[in-house]
Amino acid sequence: GVLEIVGLFSDSRVIGVCDVDYDTGTPSPQILYYDYSCLEMMLISSDSAFTPFFHTYYRGKAGFAEIRLKLLQELKWLSCYRKLNSICGWGICFNGLSMKKAFEAETQNINTAKIISQIRELNPSFTEHIRRQVDQVHKECIKNDGLPELLSITQGHDFLDYFREICSTTWS
């Protein structure tokens, strides 16, 4: 990754910029990390950066802060699962997970049962492990309540995919 690339250079002026994701290692003085988990979440956290983006695509009645918080809260379960997967080394594959398949247009919510079903489909050899992990994820969700915590654990791509689904219902 970025740390290895920076390590190839003997010049201390060479820096790398990368996502924090769920990295808990010792930071390098030559690595700059984005606030929160990734560049997308850093921009989403900033009212001045998110507001113009929000107003370009969203046509509903709610304000940007209300929608941002709703999305973060709805994604909390998935975000906690991703976090625990990274920290505990569970090896769960999330590639191919679809917000569209988990999105319920009537309520504009994410159906967690549909997320779990997709995770099982993407990881057929981990079925029993997933059942146990789901309980741990529920416990982890209790700890991550405030806006800063939600911004720190949420993946930007999940947020943007969910935002796209919400916007698609407000354009109708």
Regions found by a protein language model. Name each.
Residues 1-172:
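Acidic, divalent-metal-binding catalytic cores of TOPRIM
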